[in-house]
Amino acid sequence: MNTHIYADIITIGDEILYGQITDTNSQWISAELDKLGIKTRRKSSVSDKADEILQMLREASQRSSIVILTGGLGPTNDDITKKTLCTYFKTELVWNDAVLAHLENLFFIRGRVMNALNKEQALIPSNCEVLTNRHGTAPGMWFDVNGVVYISLPGVPFEMKGILSDVGFDKLKHRFQTPHIIHRVIKTSGVGETTLAELIADWEAALPPYMGLAYLPSAGEVKLRLTGSGDNLEQLQAEIQQQVDSVLPSIEKYVYGFDADTLEYTVGQLLKKQNKTIATAESCTGGYLAHLLTSVAGASAYYSGSVVAYQNKIKTDFLDVPAEVLSKYGAVSEETVKIMAAEVRKKFGASIGVSASGIAGPDGGTEEKPVGTIWIAYADESKVVTLKLQLSNIRENNIRMTALAILNLVRRQLKEVK
């Protein structure tokens, strides 16, 4: 079994280089290849010029055993990929009866007349194997030359994905006898990457050689991605789960979910399970917390509503924060968020009220309260819990990190995690 299989991905098109469209093809392809145990060595974008495409092909074939191209297979004059591949492989375009029959049937079903340009999509390099495109007109093409597999695909994302999902990935798996790859993601919040690494250092050091751990930090959370590879899928799945089970006791209070779980989903499930409701009072987050909570289907079962109290007048008029509290302590204070959380809970008749007030940035800070100073609060029928955050001067990150910090505070209170 070859454990070192590498791929190059080449996206073709002036529109990519000019920033007119975003290349999402290479991102998706590399993620899917990773699931097969194939590592992407390089991603490249190139213009619709034959000499540049040829240079890319020569370079890619020297470092990778798989070269995947997307784009340039359409019927217009600037679609030159097929002709360029003929130059590269020293071959010529020939008519393919199966592709032509597919085109004729497709145009008949759509009630359209096939013109000469459309028909030319049935011209393909003589040395390729056709990868049927059930989703459009341009066929995919597979070349296996001198130990390197080249796959040429349409640039239209849903057509490219369709061809690879229908036939391409299976052919790659068979051709290279790739191992099974399993990823398990442990999602944490409320803990930094370095602290997490210290907590699990012994466990990580003891991982077997066919498993690896990646730390994936982002605003408000750190993901731990455990990856294993092997020939026996069931055995590998069991061993991955054993490793997850063995590390959880060390970090359990920070773990909110696995794989596709989100913090807002986890909190929603806890609220539903405990038959509780929540209301939100937001200042610096401007409704982002409400957005996260309501992005989960079925949130009406536990989400009562929100007050976005951006101005002090709204804090006073709608949340009964006394003017003297605002005058003495300021909007960004423990005293203010405590009242906001308690009052929003009371006004909406919810089990829980939460709040946030702070200086999201990039300006507005003072020496006493610099940019990134944020207070959050949690209130239920028996207590009010507050937490001070000291974040950065990046507004978007501060808004998201504050909302996630509130959700994590709710999670820990509901699970009674200290």
Swiss-Prot record:
The family database entries (InterPro entries) matched by this protein are listed as:
CinA (IPR050101), CinA-like_C (IPR036653), CinA_C (IPR008136), CinA_KH (IPR041424), Competence-induced_CinA (IPR008135), MoaB/Mog-like_dom_sf (IPR036425), MoaB/Mog_dom (IPR001453)
| This protein's name | CinA-like protein
Cross-referenced SMART domains, in alphabetical order?
Answer: MoCF_biosynth
Give the family from UniProt.
Belongs to the CinA family.
Species of origin reads Cytophaga hutchinsonii (strain ATCC 33406 / DSM 1761 / CIP 103989 / NBRC 15051 / NCIMB 9469 / D465)
